[in-house]
């Protein structure tokens, strides 16, 4: 009996040694696989360095190589492979390296989409053809869209193109103190962007409100709103309402067939509050401006 137990113990010991020996190559294989996967990843650096067109804001230095912090407060970058989003990064001006985004990716061909804007939240890049913004509210917006082939470490300097057209209302008369808000309701443009075509992706009904400042009550007012035209040139129908604190309309004007163009300011300038009644006939001037280009129209 003792001899049998001794033989059994010896057999178990030999089995354990064999199992241990068999497992070692498996562990080595896993380690080699991990090392191989790491070696197959490449470091890519994207720097938002230039803007093809200068900003609408004339207070900013007019240069085609404007610092991103002077133009926008948010950047979103997404990479797609075979139509599937594989990377999605958002930055704002609180980030120490705002304007510089680093990623690691395996070899392959990718569609890169970058959006720079100053909205209340990050842009949603659902696909290169569908980019939207929080509450469909728009600001001056720039984009980059390019296919890249990854086969090694690389750096990319992104030259951003302006994506929007601007409508600017200039009132030459003082705004009544009862007016607290200027409301813009407009159709004909889009609040969703297609980075592959560089134009609007959907037919949108856009509403923007601008608070009237004390300075504007004392003199002329200027109000800017944006849209993505469906073609490089498009037309809008815009209704502008002056509202009191309760949201009641004090006076209102509708502008038909307003021409808009990407990277262009369409400016309507005139006396908006003549008699502060909607029945008054006002004449507005019209103009337009590049880099921003501007065209002005009288109303």
What positions do the PLM features span?
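Tryptophan-paired
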Residues: 66-126, 180-262, 293-299
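Bacterial Sec-dependent N-terminal signal peptides
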Residues: 11, 16-55, 263, 282-299
């Amino acid at each position: 009996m003792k001899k049998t137990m001794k033989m059994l113990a010896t057999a178990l010991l030999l089995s354990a040694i064999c199992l241990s020996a068999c497992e070692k190559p498996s562990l080595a294989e896993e380690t080699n696989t991990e090392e191989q996967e790491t070696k197959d990843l490449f470091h890519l650096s994207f720097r938002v360095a230039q803007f093809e067109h200068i900003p609408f804001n004339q207070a900013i230095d007019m240069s085609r190589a404007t610092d991103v912090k002077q133009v926008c407060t948010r950047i979103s970058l997404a990479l797609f492979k075979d139509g599937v989003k594989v990377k999605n990064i958002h930055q704002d001006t609180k980030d120490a390296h705002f304007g510089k985004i680093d990623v690691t990716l395996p070899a392959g061909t990718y569609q890169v989409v970058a959006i720079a804007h100053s909205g209340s939240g990050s842009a949603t890049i659902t696909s290169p053809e569908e980019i939207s913004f929080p509450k469909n509210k728009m600001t001056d917006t720039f984009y980059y869209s390019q296919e890249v082939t990854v086969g090694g470490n690389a750096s990319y300097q992104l030259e951003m193109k302006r994506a929007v057209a601007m409508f600017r209302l200039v009132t030459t008369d003082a705004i009544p103190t009862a007016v607290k808000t200027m409301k813009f309701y407009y159709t004909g443009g889009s609040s969703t962007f297609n980075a592959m075509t560089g134009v609007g992706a959907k037919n949108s009904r856009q509403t923007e409100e601008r608070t009237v400042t004390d300075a504007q009550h004392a003199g002329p007012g200027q109000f800017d709103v944006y849209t993505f035209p469906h073609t490089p040139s498009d037309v809008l129908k815009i209704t502008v309402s002056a509202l009191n604190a309760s949201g009641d309309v004090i006076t209102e004007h509708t502008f038909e067939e307003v021409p808009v163009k990407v990277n262009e300011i369409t400016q309507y300038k005139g006396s908006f509050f003549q008699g502060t009644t909607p029945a008054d006939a006002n004449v507005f001037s019209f103009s337009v401006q590049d880099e921003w280009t501007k065209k002005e129209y009288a109303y």
